[in-house]
Amino acid sequence: MVQTDQNTNSNSNDKDSQPGNLLSFLRPKNWKINLLAAKNPTWKLDKSMQKSHEIQLKAKFISRDLSWLKFDERVLDQARDTSKSLFDRLKFLAITASNLDEFFTIRMGSLYNYIDFGKERTDYSGLREVPFKQMLISSAQEFSQEKHRLFVDEILPLFPENGLLLASFADLTTLEQSEVETYFNRTIYPMLTPMVFDHTHTFPSLLAKTLIFGVVTIGGPERKVSKGKSERDRKISFVQIPLNLARFYVIEREDKIVFLPIEELIRQQLQVLYRNVEIESTTLFRITRNGDFDLVEHEDTETDFVDEIKKKIKDRRLGRVTRVEVEQEHSEFLLGEMLKRWSLEKSDIFVKTAILDFTSFWQILKHSEFKGQVAVNPPVVPPLGLKSIQIGDIFETMKRGDILLHHPYNNFEPVIQLLEQAADDPHVLAIKITLYRISKNSRIASALLRAAEQGKHVSVLFEVKARFDEENNIKEATKLQKAGCFVIYGIPGLKTHTKLLQVIRNEGTHVMSYAHLSSGNYNEDTAKLYTDLGLLTTDTRITQDIAEFFNVITGHSMPTHYEHLITAPRDMRNRLIDMIQTEMDNHKAGKAAGICWKINSLQDTLT
């Protein structure tokens, strides 16, 4: 992403007109004032931050990580919007939390891969790995603080007027307290396991993105630790809240709906897990782990690619800790032990003033109280090439001309219809498709299974390296393989992100090829939300290229060029640059010129 030159002498108060202000939210407020306070313990950090900011101002590019955080800031703006309903504002807060989880899992995880192993990298913004990490942590800390301030000061006060109560145990009536205690004893208590850490027990493997109680207990006789000072032995143990428990216990009163955070219920009953033991402190916290991994891939067919993926998925569960979120009232003794154990700095600790995990708001948003506020998709309109959204015979329809689909405004149904009709059509000889992310209970996968069971040749490139969908993709790919599909689990050294479908049909005098090309996944759920383009075509100039492409990914074909397809990593970069240059030349020559480009992100500096 290119940062344009700006007038550094501007006196405008508009934050977006200030020099480098595309990155202004990334530095702490009053950072210049702190810098002048030489006695301030943050002096070194502030000096480093100033130097980092100066480097960024000179850079021509903005890094993807800083851009990601800026995007989250815009999502938070939606939660700030007082014209929106409580439902919408709470939803956008939940989205920012999910996004930040992914940021610390992937982007910070990737950065730690360099820092921990002494590898060098320079970010697009011009910063090396350590100062860049400091910059990211600082910006994320400020963002997190503002997010919690917004919830406590502006959004939580809206709960009562909307008939809701986010309760503590003390807010419950005596009868309600008895009800939740019964629920704890019958359902929760049997699921909880205290995991102690001492000289006879190793440090437990704690799960990422789950709520955990760190419990410090004391016991035994006092022992002298220094002159005039003695203390009793301390032990640390951990109690993980099971992920399959609902995040809130819901009580429906006549006048309001009460949401009791499950951690408050457990905290109230925690002593029963430590009978005859004195609890010094309980601290609720949550960790994020590195989820970014690189595969050591080989062309050697002896290498079991799927087993390697499975191993990496297991490793991800125990990846390096990249962030600790902790409640405001916490044990410094426990925190110190965790910092040492996970090789973290104090700046990696995110102290929260409100409920620890905002992703839990999704449970509140799914409550029937909000049923009428769920966003309604706009009515679908006929795509270009069709007079109606109703399609009879998809093959006959495609023969009449190309169909351009713009999702979610155009229905995804024509694509599903092509596959489902192909699966059941006795004249269809073969189906070839690339899959990246599919929905749960996928109609796409069901159609492919049905086609294979009916004896059709079905080739599927199922990209098992689709991040966080690896497990599901392996499971679905195995089903297809068992049904008789020819399944490729990916190409060594590459991630196949293309979305292509080809149906080969015997039409008596000739064989016809029907194709679909898309920017979006073959996923009927996300097609209702994500903006993507797709093309249904029988144009032989395109279908011949697609046939060549499938020969490349399923076999050993190496065509010198395609007539109309542009592929990466072979020639996409050069072709795009050539096309951009052509438009520049046309403009200089006074000819009609312009570029319309739909992209997810732009990271290639040359482009």
Go through each PLM region and give its residues:
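Asparagine/serine/threonine-enriched low-complexity, disordered tracts
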Residues: 9-15, 34
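N-terminal localization/anchoring segments of enzymes in phospholipid and broader phosphate metabolism
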Residues: 2-5, 19-595, 604
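Ordered core of a single globular domain
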Residues: 599-601
